[in-house]
């Protein structure tokens, strides 16, 4: 398996092909992506410049491959880090597997509600040629289920990435150049999740974090976010998709960087 270049290629491909995703247009969910991005900027003064440079790279890639008609298929190994404070938060393997199934259907456009794609987007909605599987080997090369669990004394997490570090009550990422890391935990404040935007350099916090009862479509899930679409939404941020309103703090001056 390729490492950094492998995931970089996937992120670029997905940023180009994920033109329309049902989870993005569902009833408004409490996504904390903007808050998390602002947190990251306080830690890295060059983050915004790096993101803009990365977006330029994507646009250059699109321009140089405008006539390309075939696509390369990718299957990405996911590791799910379950961080729980109560028994109910320690979701089952079946619930985790149901989430992988939803991701594969959404990214492959085999989801049953694909027929509801708005007419304006029907011509560009497509199979991304990206699929997901639970990792079969851990970073040491040992057999793995792609799931790890930890009981924590932390009752709820926020957008400050503490869930991504063992020393702060969470679980450390597996090598982010070889795995997509996905954390499942309990949020405070009614948050459902967030995903980290790419910058061209893969950090040890890269991945998505999802509220435990908005993960998957079976088991301990709570309506109306019991369809597994929150993870689809947050992973789309990891693949460089913005909210359509531009995440500008309500100023109405932002952009989702997609030509309408």
Describe the predicted segments one by one.
Residues 1-7:
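N-terminal secretory signal peptides that target proteins for export/translocation
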Residues 10-19:
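Bacterial N-terminal signal peptides
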Residues 62-104, 184-187, 251:
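Fold-level signature of zinc-dependent metallopeptidase catalytic domains
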Residues 97, 101-260:
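Metzincin-family zinc-dependent endopeptidase catalytic domain
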Residues 14, 24-73, 107:
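N-terminal zymogen propeptides
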């Amino acid at each position: 398996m390729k490492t950094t270049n492998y995931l970089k290629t996937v992120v670029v491909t997905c940023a180009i092909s994920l033109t329309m995703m049902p989870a993005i247009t569902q009833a408004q969910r409490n996504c904390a992506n903007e808050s998390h991005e602002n947190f990251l900027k306080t830690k890295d003064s060059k983050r915004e410049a790096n993101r803009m440079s990365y977006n330029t790279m994507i646009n250059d890639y699109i321009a140089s491959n405008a006539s390309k008609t075939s696509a390369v298929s990718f299957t990405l190994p996911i590791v799910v880090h379950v961080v729980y404070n109560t028994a109910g938060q320690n979701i089952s393997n079946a619930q985790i597997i149901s989430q992988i199934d939803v991701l594969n259907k959404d990214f492959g456009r085999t989801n049953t509600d694909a027929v509801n794609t708005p007419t304006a987007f029907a011509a560009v909605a497509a199979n991304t040629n990206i699929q997901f599987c639970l990792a079969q080997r851990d970073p040491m090369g040992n057999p793995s289920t792609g799931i790890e669990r930890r009981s924590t004394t932390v009752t709820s997490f926020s957008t400050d990435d503490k869930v991504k570090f063992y020393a702060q009550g969470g679980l450390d990422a597996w090598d982010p150049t070889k795995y997509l890391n996905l954390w499942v935990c309990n949020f405070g404040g009614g948050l459902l999740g967030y995903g980290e935007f790419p910058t061209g350099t893969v950090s040890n916090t890269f991945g998505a974090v999802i509220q435990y009862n908005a993960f998957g479509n079976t088991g301990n899930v709570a309506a109306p976010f019991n369809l597994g679409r929150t993870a689809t939404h947050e992973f789309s941020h990891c693949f460089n998709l913005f909210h359509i309103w531009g995440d500008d703090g309500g100023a109405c001056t932002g952009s989702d960087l997609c030509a309408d």
